[in-house]
Amino acid sequence: MRGANRTGRPFTGDYAGELLYSTLLEFGFASGVYDRRPDDGLTLVDCAIINAVRCVPPQNKPTPEEIATCRRYLTPAISVLPRLKIMVALGRIAHESALRALKRTLAKFPFAHGARHPLTAAGLSLFDSYHCSRYNTNTGVLTEAMFRQVFASVRAELDRMDVQAPVLG
């Protein structure tokens, strides 16, 4: 077992976690030190990580049925975040799962790395990023700079709002 399956904390113990947590630390969404262990002292700050798919399927490719099954956990997890202003979808599956959980039409909000999608009149927005997997970074689909730019945009928007808000992963 590797990553979150081994450690019990999302994105912990694999390359995706190294990139995600270093970025969260850089932009003030985490404090402490990330050391690939759930007891490393890292603390999320005004942010939450909620997986659209709760298990790691074979070849990291969940079936539509697995995605739909996990949505019954995603929808209530989002609904209990009263201060939620921004969600960050790490990949198309997270993007589509978040939209479906919020009962939005996928065609109105196409996935695009770096895109910002206003979702509600109350100011909830969804930002898109390619997933921070080793595969995406090794193939050049996603660079560290591209990933950090998404979180720089999120931080800038939150600073304009003068609020802190959770992030969806």
Where are these regions (language model features)?
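A polyanion-binding, active-site-adjacent surface
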Residues: 1-163
